[in-house]
Amino acid sequence: MFPLRDTEMGASTFFASALPHDVCGSNGLPLTPNSIKILGRFQILKTITHPRLCQYVDITRGKHERLVVAAEHCENSLEDLLREGKLVSSSRILCIAYEVLQGLQYMNKHGMVHRALSPRNILLDRKGHVKLAKFGLYHMTAQGVDVDFPIGYPSYLAPEVIAQGMVKPSDHTQCEKPLPSGPKSDLWSLGIILFELCVGRKLFQTLEIAERLKFVITLGYVDDIVTVLAEEHGCLDIIKDLSENVITLLKKCLTFQPSKRPTPEELMHDHLFSEVSLTYPPFHKPAGLFSSSPRCADLTLPEDISQLCKDEDNDYLAERSIEEVYYLWCLAGGDLEKELVNKEIIRSKPPVCTLPNFVLEDGESFGQGRDRSSLLDDTTVTLSLCQLRNRLKDVGGEAFYPLLEDDQSTLPHSNSSSELSAAANLPLIIRERDTEYQLNRIVLFDRLLKAYPYKKNQIWKEARVDIPPLLRGITWAALLGVEGAIQAKYDAIDKDTPIPTDRQIEVDIPRCHQYDELLSSPEGHAKFRRVLKAWVVSHPDLVYWQGLDSLCAPFLYLNFNNEALAYACMSAFIPKYLYNFFLKDNSHVIQEYLTVFSQMIAFHDPELSNHLNEIGFIPDLYAIPWFLTMFTHVFPLHKIFHLWDTLLLGNSSFPFCIGVAILQQLRDRLLANGFNECILLFSDLPEIDIERCVRESINLFRWTPKSATYRQYAQPPRQANESNGTRSSMSCFSVDYQEAPRGDLSRDSIKLDDLKAEVSPRISAEDLIDLCELTGPSHSKTPIKKTKSSKPKLLVVDIRNSEDFNRGHISGSINVPFASAFTAEGDLIQCPATATLQSFKGRVVVIVGNAVKNTAAFAAHLVKSKYPRVCILDGGINKIKPTGLLTVPSPQI
């Protein structure tokens, strides 16, 4: 979007036509409200950016099908010129006409027609240049079908529009749409407007509306419409004095037959504008982030750089995009409906005044005044930025231009000031509503994202603090490593040819996050369908499973106007977190995943694990929808956004920690209930505190050895050329264990049945060496740095017999022989070694032995005794022997 600069923002409102409540669609579901349909169609208007068009910013839905639209606005319009009654020069007429044609031509290029062109909708900025307002009303209302008022003004409607009349569908279940107006209809409207500017007065003012329409239709019988209009309004002398170019222009616009009337594109290239067009360089839309063309191709700098900073009183806020300014305006307390209420555009009527005077037995009522609220109020209210500017008055100019190359090592988190670093410690919900904080984060992320992928490392660093909601979609794409010409790839996929999956997709979409207005709109459904189908078609080795629609929802919501980016994000997300989950036979992948999850529950919360296993409430009964959809099936979108902000920074094992964190929030209720109550509890999941869930899942992740979540069916290591260079920017929090180079000390794959038989997870010998710091602290890869005063995080329990232990053991380990460790009841036999074990309760305990069965059984006994963080050394002591790290106790003399 363009910067706000000298323009302002305005709000206008209208009502969508109400639908009957007792009618269902052809699919048996209630009809989608017209306001929802309009809201969905509106979104594409936000992407149409041109100097001659007022930028659309937002639309909100109120009560009783009310819609409020926010858009770029200018105080002056051609209406003001007409009100002054001054004649406009021929050269100025040609300039105005050319600028209007520029806007119309760009709209037509995007498949849109204005249809409501009038002097009040042709705005003038402070430099006198044209900006077309309300150009999207005809498009968003489905050519006027979804509203009870006509689109357009009687005096400016083209003859073919009047001849068609106002068509309203009689049956709401049928798609009876009128024939849409074409680009040539706008040229007639432009011709009437230019005629009015030439003569300095409005036409048809003495005629009733019906007479006006009738008069326009009768113009088909005359040869020279311009002369007839001049004679009717007594201004023939003025018309005769106009330049030949202007008269020719008026005649071309006011051609009665649409077939003989030019399009805006054709008229723009007419010889009439041969001189005018030279003063207007062609408009090139800036290349997007994921573009196949160089983003800096059209970058130009002034010859004298000092010209950029000559004005000391720069309005830095006005240099930000309209979208950003509007977002900050809302954070600073801005409310569209409230602004309209203050200007008395929205008026509430006491309910008693709406009662009828007389009601018959059959329900027919009489005596009610006509409700005029459904008609169009064309007023646009200017939104005041005073409150926002007041909030930002203490923000210095340097905040709008952060330096990205400076060494900011003195700041704990961010490139922001010390106050912002302090604000970064506030709860996320407060940070996201803080105007100053969000301004700084948006400006910083905007600059970093414009330098993507060069600034990929810094994007990762800043995302660990938080992600500004306004830029979440594009930031997620950067975190997922999306690059290249994504639009061309998406366009190349066949999304039209019917496939067997179509039926299932059609069934699933109307049930996916339909509480959200955007995703429940017909436009949202169509985009869902295309993105899902593109993914299915482009992954022939995978299949569509129910839940894929939920997985798609966050990406589609954040990139509603960029299906290609939503598809690219989804295609990057699934291999990382859900590798092979969508195979036709995915049972081995799912079973391994759930088994590792069970081990994680036992590792972090043995008491809860014991209880769930005793009542038979296994993860297969509740966790498949969690992981298959990465929690999008169980949480609303606003919670998913905060959850995934952290998930995308973690590796593929992080979802296990999220799952355990959810269970721990429900811990008391789960421990107090049996199988049936737990099933009921998870059928309607209680409210989960997502911020707490994220905080606890990070803590759980830090306590989990990297190799404990190893899965043989996880994504294999990528080639260097496939990783997009992201690996270098990731911390150990983000890199998968599978990505690390394989060695003799790495974990080995085991059969699924053997994995299921073990309650506690295995860890690799290299993890054990790192955690014990046997190779020195410089090689530690764990997320938590060990301080000098802290106790060891880990205890090694060697369960071999004492003779084997004395021949060689891991430094710092204790010996608890398996054969004599437990009583018949399963309790630990008390001895100095078990006392040490009890003192380490709460830290990581690694069981080491010769026989796998014994180590697994010993670990299971400890879990039964509610020892947390118990794991098994993969490969036993034999894995450590070749390293030369075993020690022999000094002989007792």
Swiss-Prot record:
Lineage, broadest ranks: Eukaryota, Metazoa, Chordata, Craniata, Vertebrata
Record localization: Cytoplasm; Cytoplasm, Cytoskeleton, Spindle; Midbody; Early endosome
UniProt keyword Cytoplasm present: yes
Domain remark from Swiss-Prot or TrEMBL: The protein kinase domain is predicted to be catalytically inactive.
Source organism per UniProt: Gallus gallus
Annotated ranges, domain Protein kinase: 1-274
Function of the molecule: Component of the FERRY complex (Five-subunit Endosomal Rab5 and RNA/ribosome intermediary). The FERRY complex directly interacts with mRNAs and RAB5A, and functions as a RAB5A effector involved in the localization and the distribution of specific mRNAs most likely by mediating their endosomal transport. The complex recruits mRNAs and ribosomes to early endosomes through direct mRNA-interaction. Also involved in the modulation of mTOR signaling and expression of mTOR complex components. Involved in the control of actin-cytoskeleton organization.
Record-linked InterPro entries: Kinase-like_dom_sf (IPR011009), Prot_kinase_dom (IPR000719), Rab-GAP-TBC_dom (IPR000195), Rab-GAP_TBC_sf (IPR035969), Rhodanese-like_dom (IPR001763), Rhodanese-like_dom_sf (IPR036873)
Family listed: Belongs to the protein kinase superfamily.
Keywords: Cytoplasm, Cytoskeleton, Endosome
Keyword Methyltransferase attributed: no
Assembly and interaction partners: Component of the FERRY complex.
Superkingdom of the organism of origin: Eukaryota
Protein name per its UniProtKB record: TBC domain-containing protein kinase-like protein
